[in-house]
């Protein structure tokens, strides 16, 4: 029998965090314990589909786009209440979201920072004011075409999305330092 040695693949951003970012954060903030250091816990990509109330095909196309971008199947968000003014009935699909953890999360962050964000037209950097007070960062993208996985010719409708990077940081300064060290392009005011 032949022996096969399986080499475990480690995402580039995860290696960067372990080798350079974590020691730099420990030195900057003076953490005594390794578990005190802020780290990325999960990334949530949310796509609102308000227009799906009129056309159900939009949900399928949005799911295909989110699946291509994130690499996993999204969960459909459904309306909890009926609202007549919005022509919305209880149980109708109004959005989709994906929660990524582990290696898939690190790969997505790598693709987002190195490939997708630089492709945005007139991109001057992310605002550093979108932290929530607990070190989590949320920002919106206006279109899905900046991701290489989306075929430009097959886009039926421009869809935006919200991306939330949840960290274990206790303050916004720790979260900002973590994301800046990972390579997030924040604006310099």
Curated annotation (Swiss-Prot):
Belongs to the universal ribosomal protein uL5 family. One of its GO terms (biological process) is translation. Part of the 50S ribosomal subunit; part of the 5S rRNA/L5/L18/L25 subcomplex. Contacts the 5S rRNA and the P site tRNA. Forms a bridge to the 30S subunit in the 70S ribosome. It holds the Pfam family Ribosomal_L5_C. One of its GO terms (cellular component) is ribosome. This is Large ribosomal subunit protein uL5. One of its GO terms (molecular function) is rRNA binding. The gene is rplE. Gene3D superfamilies: 3.30.1440.10. This is one of the proteins that bind and probably mediate the attachment of the 5S RNA into the large ribosomal subunit, where it forms part of the central protuberance. In the 70S ribosome it contacts protein S13 of the 30S subunit (bridge B1b), connecting the 2 subunits; this bridge is implicated in subunit movement. Contacts the P site tRNA; the 5S rRNA and some of its associated proteins might help stabilize positioning of ribosome-bound tRNAs. SUPFAM superfamilies: RL5-like. It comes from Kocuria rhizophila (strain ATCC 9341 / DSM 348 / NBRC 103217 / DC2201).
């Amino acid at each position: 029998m032949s022996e096969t040695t399986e080499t475990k693949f480690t995402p580039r951003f995860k290696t960067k965090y372990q080798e350079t970012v974590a020691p730099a954060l420990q030195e900057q903030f003076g953490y005594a314990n390794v578990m005190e250091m802020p780290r990325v816990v999960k990334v949530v990509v949310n796509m609102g589909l308000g227009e799906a109330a009129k056309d159900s095909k939009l949900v399928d196309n949005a799911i295909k786009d989110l699946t291509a971008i994130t690499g996993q199947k999204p969960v459909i968000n459904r309306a909890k209440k009926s609202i007549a003014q919005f022509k919305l009935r209880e149980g109708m699909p109004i959005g989709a979201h994906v929660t990524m953890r582990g290696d898939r999360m690190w790969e997505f962050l790598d693709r987002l920072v190195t490939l997708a964000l630089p492709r945005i037209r007139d991109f001057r950097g992310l605002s550093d004011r979108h932290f929530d007070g607990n070190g989590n960062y949320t920002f919106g993208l206006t279109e899905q075409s900046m991701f290489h996985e989306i075929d430009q010719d097959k886009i039926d409708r421009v869809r935006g999305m919200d991306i939330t990077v949840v960290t274990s940081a206790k303050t916004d300064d720790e979260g900002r330092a973590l994301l800046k060290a990972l390579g997030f392009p924040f604006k310099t005011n």
